[in-house]
């Protein structure tokens, strides 16, 4: 099936404040909010990077950390500075998806990809924290990986596969 992707920006809808304490809470909050404006199914996501040695931060504040520092590049430098003497470099990319089917049912799933934080920024591909995240069993960051290879293994792909299975597409 073909689906048309419509973003809140194209509908001139501002995103709601993310007041949830988890990725799923924020994803659910957004899907309920955006569903008020349209009469078709809506999928919303909330994603981020959780670093064990930093008490799972930036977590739900991943995008806000980049905004606070002025860019993802500066946020990555900030993270690498905090990680400088840390032995535990384990991290997890998380994507929570919520689907409102327009019949009053909201379905939520979460995709997780474990990896580790690189010692320096490597690569220019992808976006966000991709240049410092090395998936387990890989030797390069997402920022160094070809786009198609990254897309077929990342946390969003995992979440969409779970959603697809749950709603039986």
Per-range role (PLM):
Residues 1-169:
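Anionic-ligand binding patches
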């Amino acid at each position: 099936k073909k689906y048309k992707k419509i973003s809140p920006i194209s509908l001139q809808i501002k995103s709601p404040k993310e007041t949830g304490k988890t990725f799923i809470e924020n994803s659910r909050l957004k899907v309920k909010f955006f569903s008020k404006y349209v009469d078709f199914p809506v999928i919303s996501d909330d994603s981020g990077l959780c670093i064990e040695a930093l008490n799972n931060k930036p977590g739900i504040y991943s995008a806000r950390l980049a905004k606070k520092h002025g860019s993802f590049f500066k946020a990555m430098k900030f993270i690498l500075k905090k990680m400088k003497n840390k032995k535990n470099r384990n991290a997890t990319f998380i994507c929570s998806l919520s689907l409102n089917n327009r019949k009053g049912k909201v379905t939520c799933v979460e995709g997780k990809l474990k990896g580790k934080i690189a010692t320096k920024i490597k690569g220019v591909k992808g976006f966000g924290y991709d240049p410092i995240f090395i998936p387990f069993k890989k030797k390069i960051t997402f920022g160094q990986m070809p786009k198609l290879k990254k897309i077929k293994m990342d946390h969003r792909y995992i979440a969409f596969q779970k959603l697809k299975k749950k709603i039986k597409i």
